[in-house]
Curated annotation (Swiss-Prot):
GO terms for molecular function: ATP binding; tetrahydrofolylpolyglutamate synthase activity; UDP-N-acetylmuramoylalanine-D-glutamate ligase activity. Keywords: ATP-binding, Cell cycle, Cell division, Cell shape, Cell wall biogenesis/degradation, Cytoplasm, Ligase, Nucleotide-binding, Peptidoglycan synthesis. NCBIfam families: murD. It is an enzyme of class 6 (ligase). It comes from Helicobacter pylori (strain J99 / ATCC 700824) (Campylobacter pylori J99). GO terms for biological process: cell division; cell wall organization; peptidoglycan biosynthetic process; regulation of cell shape. This is UDP-N-acetylmuramoylalanine--D-glutamate ligase.
């Protein structure tokens, strides 16, 4: 079979290895290739312009490639990673799938839920690191998948037993073109889910036509305290605060519903679940607090790549003066709602990256103190010279990092290095 993999990344490379083992003819197409070559694994790699849809029997697209890309527009047999994996399931092996999506919190919630489900041999994958084809080859019986809006957009058949949507706020508008498309991508899986499946959704989407018309069973939530109350757990029983408390509450809710489906009693598992969750450590670059040599507080929230994540971070330091490093690739999002919230805080801005001039203009409009630093190191230097002991320095950029860094992780690591440098 002639297979074209659109995009040369972690997901498609894992698929390429699988296809190669099964004696298929595999070609990669990517904008980053200026000419034909063979990569380190011997795969044939071509520039995107060389893709010929008539010389291909199956195309699988990297989730990061937009539906407006010429490769996708030309493809005649396009399939998502999720749908291809779904086509491999049969009576000998079909895993149970739980999908978690949302603008913010999906990585943390996926990791928390996987920890809770360890006794059921749960493994995490999808956006979180392990491609689905590798989970399939390992024959893992229970998959907890962090699922992006990109993957959901391209998926037309596959659906999970339980779908958790944590939140939907403006993000990835360059890819999706507008917020309506982004929201519809997040809700699309509900059109595929049967009566035997369960969707756990924010209350504000209860009246949305896609939600109303879905056959799936539905549970709606609003605040973390209400979720915990339903589970008969006092909120002080968990060692998390702010957005992380909601992540923990929702992980527990999915766990409770999974047990219910398995005809197991929640009360028999509740105490152990709390112990496991309270031992869980939040990952790097998510509200990661540290102190400089003078004992002043700095916070690495580099994973805050959108407005909502930054707003959640600000709430934590409501009663302190905040020195906020903001900027990067804002992905076509209007930052005005963020600036409207600044009136509730004592805040100074330090603008970096490709959106620095936009941030400066909004700061003038909303009368917010702002220094245009462009580079992260310059922003750190400026803050170092004025930061007081009772204040906080916060990197929560409300933007992607790829205009200046290889990833949000590199941005966070460099931030910490600049702060701790003499």
């Amino acid at each position: 079979m002639k297979i074209s993999l659109l995009g040369h990344g972690k997901t498609t490379l894992a698929l390429g290895r699988f296809f190669k083992k099964n004696h298929n003819e595999v070609k990669f197409f990517d904008d980053k290739f200026p000419a034909f070559f063979k990569d380190s694994e011997g795969f044939l790699c071509y520039p995107s312009k060389d893709f010929n849809p008539n010389d291909s029997q199956l195309e699988i697209v990297s989730p990061g490639i937009s539906f407006t890309h010429p490769l996708v527009m030309k493809a005649k047999h396009l399939m998502s990673e999720y749908d291809y994996i779904d086509s491999l399931f049969d009576h000998s092996f079909t895993p149970t799938m739980i999908s978690i999506s949302g603008t913010n919190g999906k990585t943390t919630t996926t990791e928390m839920l996987t920890t809770l489900l360890e006794d059921f041999k749960a493994v995490s994958g999808g956006n979180i690191g392990t491609p689905l084809i590798e989970l399939f080859e390992k024959r893992s019986p229970l998959w907890v998948l962090e699922t992006s809006s990109f993957s959901l957009h391209y998926t037309n058949k596959a659906y999970p037993l339980i779908y958790l949507l944590i939140n939907v706020e403006a993000d990835h508008l360059t890819w999706h073109c507008n917020f309506e498309n982004y929201l519809n991508a997040k809700l699309k899986v509900l059109t595929l889910m049967p009566k035997t499946s369960l969707a756990i959704l924010p209350l504000k989407f209860k009246e949305h036509p896609i939600v109303q018309n879905s056959q799936a069973q539905k549970i709606f939530f609003d605040k973390s305290e209400e979720v915990l109350e339903c589970l008969k757990i006092p909120s002080n029983a968990l060692f998390f605060k702010g957005a992380f408390l909601l992540d923990a509450a929702l992980a527990l809710l999915v766990y409770e519903q999974f047990l219910k489906i398995k005809n197991l009693k929640w009360q028999d598992y509740r105490e152990n679940a709390l112990k496991r969750l309270n031992a869980f450590k939040i990952g790097s670059h998510k509200m990661e607090e540290f102190r400089d040599k003078q004992g002043r507080l700095w916070v690495d929230d580099s994973k805050a790549t959108n407005i909502d994540a930054t707003l959640q971070a600000l709430k934590t330091f409501k009663n302190q003066k905040i020195h906020l490093i903001l900027g990067g690739d804002i992905k076509g999002v209007n930052l005005t709602p963020l600036f409207e919230e600044f009136k509730n805080y004592k805040i100074s801005l330090y603008a970096i990256g490709s959106s620095a001039s936009i941030i400066q203009a909004l700061a003038l409009e909303f009368n917010v103190s702002c220094q245009v630093c462009l580079k992260l190191e310059k922003a750190v230097q400026e803050i170092k010279s004025v930061l007081l002991q009772n204040e906080v320095a916060l990197l929560s950029p409300s933007a992607a990092s790829l205009d200046q860094f290889s990833s949000y992780k590199e941005r966070g690591e460099k931030f910490k290095a600049f702060v701790l440098k003499d």
